[in-house]
Swiss-Prot record:
Protamines substitute for histones in the chromatin of sperm during the haploid phase of spermatogenesis. They compact sperm DNA into a highly condensed, stable and inactive complex. It is found in: Nucleus; Chromosome. This is Sperm protamine P1. Keywords: Chromosome, Developmental protein, Differentiation, Disulfide bond, DNA condensation, DNA-binding, Nucleosome core, Nucleus, Spermatogenesis. Pfam families: Protamine_P1 (PF00260). One of its GO terms (biological process) is chromosome condensation. One of its GO terms (molecular function) is DNA binding.
Length: 51
């Protein structure tokens, strides 16, 4: 199954596709692209608050 991962950089709002990796990284990976996009936006918001 292909999973979508949340993008780490703020400039990119897109999420990239990712193959199944080790069980450790399973938490961050999302099953659908929409979920990944949500995760992405949430992270950006939290980062902005910190600064």
């Amino acid at each position: 199954m292909a999973r979508y991962r949340c993008c780490r950089s703020q400039s990119r709002s897109r999420c990239y596709r990712q193959r199944q990796t080790s069980r450790r990284r399973r938490r961050r990976s999302c099953q659908t692209q929409r979920r990944a996009m949500r995760c992405c936006r949430r992270r950006n918001r939290l980062r902005r608050r910190k600064h």
